[in-house]
Amino acid sequence: MTDFVNCYENATRAEAYAKLEFANTYHLAFRDLPEILHTHVNGSAALDFGCGTGRSTRLLRQLGFEVAGVDISAEMIARARAIDPQGDYRLIPDDDMSALPRAGFSLIQSAFTFDNIPGAETKIRLFRSLRELLRPDGILVNTVSTPEIYVNEWASFSTEDFPENQNAKPGDPVKIITTDFEDRSPAADILWPHASYLEVYDRSGLEVLEVRKPLARGDEPYPWISETRIAPWVIYVLRPQK
């Protein structure tokens, strides 16, 4: 996967992400996950694609799934194994998922992974590979950033140093700083709006079952900035096309 620029493949970023929890803006990305999985998923075999340091993998296990986490970053996988020695964390080279069981998973979760993957063709290739890993009744939950996250301020993020984000077009790079940890080096993501994702899903042989854009309710113990008015995340619930 020669055009995959992974800005998270370094020890400093892995160490920073290992300290993240489900607080502040990140709370909204996972708050509704138990309900979504209860509604749509039958079975317990799960894959966490782009697991990073294992935060989302451990959540799935807490929710009762038998889960394997995979990532292309050796630093992230090393950190996940250090935090959770009993967990199943696997390093995959680029987008080679041939070692994973075909039609072996009732659930595949991908949290924020596709924010950093450029180009429709690369996204489609990955989604097709993930589709082949799903059981016929399996579900793929893809959580990604909304375009609005890159032009507003948040409890967990800042974009005020990057006014060029305002003029970004679909497929352009955008920058964002995570304020929940000390490493303030910006992440370089790819702007990919809703219509572009719908096209990618269709070409990948995936059907959209549900779309959620979670907002903060205002009664949570977090210092919301934009979260009660603007959704930072969009959660796509997908299944193989019939």
What are these regions (language model features)?
Residues 204-242:
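C-terminal lobe and adjacent flexible extensions of AdoMet/dcAdoMet transferase-like proteins
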Residues 110-113:
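A short beta-strand submotif of the Rossmann-like class I SAM-dependent methyltransferase core
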Residues 141-202:
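SAM-dependent methyltransferase
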Residues 1-41, 55, 59:
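Conserved class I S-adenosyl-L-methionine
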Residues 47-49, 53-97:
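Class I SAM-dependent methyltransferase SAM/SAH-binding core
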Residues 99-108:
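A short acidic, Gly/Pro-enriched loop at the edge of an enzyme's catalytic core
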Residues 124-136:
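A short glycine-rich, Lys/Arg-flanked "PGG" loop and its adjoining helix->strand segment in the class I
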Residues 115-119:
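A short His-aromatic
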